[in-house]
A protein has these predicted regions:
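Extracellular/periplasmic carbohydrate-active domains that bind, remodel
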Residues: 1-420
Length: 420
């Protein structure tokens, strides 16, 4: 697949055939508000007070030189080549013939389009509501949702089978398949799914609260003898549905992934967490809206034993943490020993939710986290670092600056402390 990720000399960029999205760390000496100049082939292309910039109306398959400067000199420079223009695979056209009426379930048609998608092709969703069950993506592919297009997961648990190896609340286990599944979980290995783009102006949504309730009810029945025999364990959990609730799927599950770019979309109503990346590297999420109002454990963006994960210019309306930085729980997370590090969160806004959190699952360690220019005033927690007494692990090198926060909390919590 033509490369869409570039990182060099202090700058990182993602590109399409006609655009480049560029970002950089805020300089240590910068004030709360600074102006940056972006030069494209030695000519000023943009002035911005943000630490990111998108340049559009570029030429496909063209090499550009980028340079960012501010009052104290250079931020960095980067040479980048835009991708070729991709051929569109319209999901409504033959041989897929998906129906965007909000009623027909298109799982087979959409999976065929995904399976057919090559590295120089793009799966295209025109406006419409495309109902589906679980879908499995592969390396070197792109989904593009046009404005008004909704990829809508059903609320039927049967549509999220088979169960897959996953990790929830710090423990590896079998969970329902997510709406979108990228990669296969393996804590002993590197990436097995790479170079995937999810972008556009549309929405990727799942069954939300109703799907969660149905899965929990089914799992509660399946585990009724175990729950009855382990009443003491159940009493130490957050609530009676904690254990049966752990098999719920995420909205987008990224296991052992690398070079994943999510841009411009609305992600909504996973049955638990929305965007979950575990044992993954180089995940970029920008200019997205994440919604999970009323969903229990409805986290927005969760890097978990992952590295080089960046989110910026995003809005959150979540039923739990907007961002939750994790790395496993209790002995298992410590033994697996895959820390989360090199995390960047900037220019993000909370309209509802719990804010930005590190933990409580962090026994694999968390380090090198930088957060700046975020508004978490409308959140219940603001910034929270939380652990339990038996976690182990570490949290270090966390830098937070130029943010509006409702609270700052560093504390021990008494829930979610069971584990292998």
């Amino acid at each position: 697949m033509p490369n869409h990720f570039f990182s060099q000399n202090g700058l990182t960029a993602c590109c399409t055939d006609t655009s480049i999205t560029l970002f950089w760390d805020k300089p240590a000496a910068a004030g709360a508000v600074e102006t940056y100049t972006v030069l494209l082939d030695d000519a000023a292309a943009a002035h911005t007070q943000k630490t990111h910039c998108t340049l559009e109306n570029l030429r496909p398959e063209t090499t550009y030189s980028l340079f960012v400067q501010w009052r104290s000199g250079s931020i960095g420079e980067l040479t980048i080549r835009t991708t070729p223009t991709k051929r569109c695979l319209d999901v409504t056209a033959s041989p897929y013939s998906a129906v965007g009426d909000g009623k027909a379930v298109n799982t087979a048609a959409l999976q065929k389009a995904i399976d057919d998608c090559g590295e120089r092709e793009q799966i295209y969703f025109p406006a419409g509501v495309y109902c589906t069950g679980t879908l499995r993506l592969h390396s070197n592919m792109e989904l593009y949702l046009e404005e008004g297009a909704v990829l809508q997961g059903t609320a039927d648990p049967e549509d999220y089978l088979p169960r897959i190896s996953s990790r929830f609340e710090g423990t590896e286990m079998e969970c329902y398949s997510s709406l979108l599944n990228l990669g296969t979980l393996d804590h002993t290995a590197g990436p097995n799914c790479e170079n995937v783009i999810l972008r556009g102006k549309g929405t990727i949504a799942s069954g939300g609260k109703l799907l969660a309730e149905r899965i929990i009810a089914s799992e509660r029945e399946r585990l009724k003898d175990y729950l009855a025999q382990n009443a003491t364990l159940v009493s130490t959990c957050e609530n009676a549905d904690t254990i049966p609730g752990r098999v719920r799927p995420r909205l987008v599950n990224m296991s052992n992934c690398r070079n994943i770019w999510m841009e411009g979309l609305t992600f909504a109503n996973g049955a638990s967490w929305n965007l979950h990346m575990v044992y993954s590297d180089q995940i970029v999420t920008d200019h997205c809206t994440i919604r999970s109002d009323g969903v229990w454990n409805g986290d927005g963006w969760d890097p978990d034993s992952s590295t080089n994960c960046t989110i910026f210019a995003c809005e959150f309306f979540t039923g739990d943490d907007a961002v939750a930085i994790k790395s496993g729980k209790n002995p298992e997370g410590n033994i697996i020993d895959r820390p989360t590090k090199h995390i960047r969160v900037f220019d993000c806004h909370s309209g509802f939710g719990h804010g930005i959190c590190i933990g409580s699952e962090m026994s694999g360690g968390v380090e090198d986290v930088k957060i700046w220019d975020c508004d978490m005033a409308v959140s219940t927690s603001g910034l929270e670092i939380k652990v339990t007494k038996k976690r182990g692990g570490y949290v270090r090198n966390v830098e937070v600056r130029d943010c509006t926060l409702s609270h700052v909390m560093v504390h021990s919590v008494g829930y979610n402390d069971d584990g292998i």
